[in-house]
Amino acid sequence: WAIGFNADGTAFIARNGLSVSVSFGGQAVKLGGGINKVRKLTDSAAVGGLTLLTDDFAATTQNTEPGVDVILSPVDDGTGTYAVKPTIGRQTQYVVEQVLESTGSIPIPEGKAVLTLNAKESEEALARLRALQPGDTVTLTVSSSDQRWSQAVQALGGVSKLVTNGQVDSGLDASRTAWPAIGIKADGTVIFYAMDGKQPGYSVGATQGQVAQRLIELGCVEAICMDGGGSTTIGVTYPDQEGMQVVNKPSDGSQRKNSTAIFLTTGLQPTGELASYYVTPSDSILLSGATVQLSATGLDTSYFPTSGGGVSWSVSSGGGTVDENGLFTAGAESGFAQVTATDGSASGTGYITTVRTPDEITLTNEATGAAVASLNLDPGGQVDLKASASYRKLALTAQDTCF
């Protein structure tokens, strides 16, 4: 299964149904090793063998054993008849530059490709490749049984289909771990979702079935699960900050190297025309009576930071109060507060959760950070204590006056 994205931003989930072959010497040959995959020997299922590597794969072929490598240069006749890179629903025509007997890895020239085969493959297959001469033509054909893939401009493979026609799919992985997933709602809206896991005391994760149920709750009628575990990461660039920040909690402790990812980018440019305010922190969780300082950053019509004017603050729904400087004080009851900053023409909103009764309160020694369950002090002795509260394993913002 995979998810595809079209040029207009719409998405779909389907099996790719790909068929990949190369034609040369009057014969079409299945590309059993695929495109831009590590070269492997052909197995009993006829997977592996002849492999095409473009410069998108790496700087080198990364082969570790001897084999036959054919350096190919794509043909661009200027008419658009052939694609210059492998494309579903199109053919790419190459001209042979060199045929090499390689002992291992070789460079992949920029803008070119390498057709490669392990020296342990059948003599017939090796002879067919060795018969190629500089100037010969090799034609790559990539097709799919699902024509939608011919229109997709981006795609990413997944491990399981989670939701079909608004129903949870069968045969899903029942292990609890971290999972990233992508869902599509009936109106075409795409949801990017991540569940942290493998961290007892914070989040043990979820089964694929539970992730599917959650995506259905969010309105998804189709959904796919990507590879889970420690690679599960969501990062964003906030309007008032530079560079991407990881906003979930990867189980490896930090973001790790991934071979596949989806990046959402914008072609918008700064306009300098004030349109709204970005209120931070926008999703705080406070213990009743706690305070948090809010700030409002001006955003232009393209969501880039820009100069704003003086703003007034108000709580438009929920409990709590906010003063003229943006200092919010949580109310006495649990609930959700919507805090608005406005200059009369542009505005922005932040959302704050108030918890009246925490699940746990802990005490620590202010100086050492050590947990305190009991105290033995000499007469007149003093120790500074720090109280902390949590709700559903989430730390609550609180001050000493809250306890």
Features from the language model and the residues they span:
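Gly/Ser/Thr/Pro-rich low-complexity, intrinsically disordered segments
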Residues: 1-402
